Amino acid sequence: MIRNGTGWCEMRVQTTIEIFDYWNRIRGAADAPLKSQVEPSAVPHLLQSLFILEAREDGDIVFRLAGTRICDLFGRDLRGERFSSLWAHGQHGDIERTAIGVMDHAMPALFNTTGYSIVGHQASFEIIMMPLRSSNGACDRVLGAIAPVAAASWLEIVPLEFLALDRSRLLPEKFSKVAPAELRPINEIVAAKSIGFGQAMRRVVSQLLSAEAR
């Protein structure tokens, strides 16, 4: 784990650490900041690695904005494209449900992924997803970042074909103060058929708070 400005976290990439710290600062005591509070001039060195997702009326989660480095990683402009289109086919449903959960429950999520190129290269990435609110109070956007764990000479030259999810976990509000020993993976939560997503999220948070109390 790495100590950042808001506490202990499992993030290991400077880009995701910095944007999470920024998001945490501007939200203050709220569960999520207003999208109008996000000032590009405050994080100019991160812009190329940032993205914003939105939910369309048909339920699709799409890129509203994608930084130049992200577009270069995949060899195309991602604006308007479904977020799930970047992922391995068997993971589309889990990825979309996680993005919706970040907005519905105003709770950030952290992914560890492996990206595979069209010629067989692979690289590890860290992805952070954080909720944003509109002026009407609705939590209807996701601010995120995609960053490689280590530099690779072929990145941004040979396009990625898809991402594969290796691990995912929630970053509840208390996470900025104390890091529990283990966070239940999101893909386990969304796969649970016997309980709703909201109930599962509340159960996870309850477990985390109990761990902190001990």
Regions found by a protein language model. Give the residues of each.
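Sensory/regulatory domains in signal-transduction proteins
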Residues: 2-166
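Regulatory/sensor and coupling segments of signal-transduction and defense proteins
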Residues: 2-7, 150-214
